[in-house]
């Protein structure tokens, strides 16, 4: 990235840990956009092996979800994970290292255009106190739940690298 002159992106990589990686999880090679996605995939594979979920997949959509007639971004959305629960229910999980306004816009559009889809928001960590509380409150309107990944990763310990 430095060669291309994206200094701001370089800073984001340092602060947020958004380093793409290629890793094997569940016997398959995956191209993750960030370390958070890699760790979450390990957690989902752990749940699958423990028979807590039926299956999971990453960036498995042949094309993005389009928001027809929308002129202002976002006009399309590609979710991170698809989790199939043991009863066959499919849940879309969106992972975010930092919860921002555009994330809520995507969630709101998904709820409007694809109301049959179940969404969950997975945050790298949920700050204590009021920081980001309004964004989380808004996101709760469009998601089944918001998950704090840092709590899960602490509980998993050495099982997730």
Placement of each model-derived feature along the sequence:
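Electrostatic, structured charged patches in enzyme active sites and in nucleic-acid/phosphate-binding
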Residues: 1-161
